[in-house]
């Protein structure tokens, strides 16, 4: 317990999770803390009304709480002076893949993608040509050389069909097979699917099978339409 001068007390409890990917979704995380199987819940009700143990809940990740401490210390105006017009502040990204300098970086929202890849990351390793960068984790999308002038913020990435997500950036070079990359991430989501939503549970399996078929040299143009149809159904029908 921590006691302040005004007599306010609160308890901090640390609960260890098993690292399930689905627990990145807030209602799944609360289910895990409650001791039941981690599965997403329909919203509404939202956590602010009915969250952990059906009580009003303020649920945020560590990066948000770190930003709150900065705002409390330096004021909201100081924090809002950083970033882009709609995405204020900074974001931590994890640079990985075929890039010279990997690691964690913190940049202002609105920095151009090319500046992150080339100025901070040093460009592709071994003098290879840049092909794409996958953003937003397994559920994100890929950006190519034509997106180098794109500001990295929520609105700009959303406008081209990808997300910031947890801040992952995996760089691919000219030697990378994008179908293999897609198959790798789909294999992960297939294994990590909680199984609650049929479109996700079955869709990831079907997409993985189609990508396996393509990479084995047996693909056909009709497979592309099947992939689009399954992906659309999953996006429209799955909870998270």
What label would you give each PLM region?
Residues 1, 10-12, 124-159:
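Terminal amphipathic helices with adjacent charged low-complexity linkers/tails
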Residues 1-109, 121:
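Hydrophobic alpha-helical positions that pack around
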Residues 1-6, 145-239:
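Ferredoxin-type iron-sulfur electron-transfer modules in oxidoreductases and energy-metabolism complexes
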Residues 8, 89, 101, 129, ...:
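A generic structural signal for well-ordered coil/turn residues at beta-strand boundaries
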Residues 109-125:
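Short amphipathic, charge-patterned alpha-helical segments
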Residues 113-116, 129, 193, 207:
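Extended, hydrophobic alpha-helical segments in both membrane/secreted and soluble proteins
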């Amino acid at each position: 317990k921590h006691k302040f001068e005004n007599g306010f007390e609160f308890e901090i409890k640390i609960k260890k999770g098993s690292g399930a990917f689905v627990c990145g979704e807030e209602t799944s995380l609360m289910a895990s803390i409650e001791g039941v199987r981690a599965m997403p819940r329909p919203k509404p009700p939202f956590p602010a009304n009915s969250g952990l143990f059906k009580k009003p809940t303020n649920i945020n990740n560590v990066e948000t709480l770190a930003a709150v401490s900065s705002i409390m210390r330096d004021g909201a105006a100081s924090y809002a002076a950083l970033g882009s017009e709609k995405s204020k502040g900074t974001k931590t990204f994890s640079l990985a893949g075929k890039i010279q300098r990997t690691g964690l970086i913190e940049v202002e929202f609105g920095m151009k993608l090319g500046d992150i890849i080339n100025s901070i990351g040093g460009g592709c390793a071994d003098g290879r040509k840049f092909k794409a960068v996958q953003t937003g984790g397994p559920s994100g999308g890929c950006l190519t050389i034509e997106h180098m002038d794109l500001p990295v913020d929520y609105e700009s990435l959303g406008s081209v069909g990808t997300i910031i997500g947890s801040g992952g950036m995996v760089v691919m070079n000219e030697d990378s097979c994008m179908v293999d990359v897609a198959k790798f991430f789909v294999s992960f989501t297939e294994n990590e699917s909680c199984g609650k939503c049929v479109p996700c549970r079955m869709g990831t399996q079907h997409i993985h099978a189609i990508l396996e078929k393509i990479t084995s040299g047996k693909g056909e143009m009709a497979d592309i339409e099947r992939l689009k149809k399954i992906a659309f159904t999953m996006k429209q029908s799955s909870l998270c």
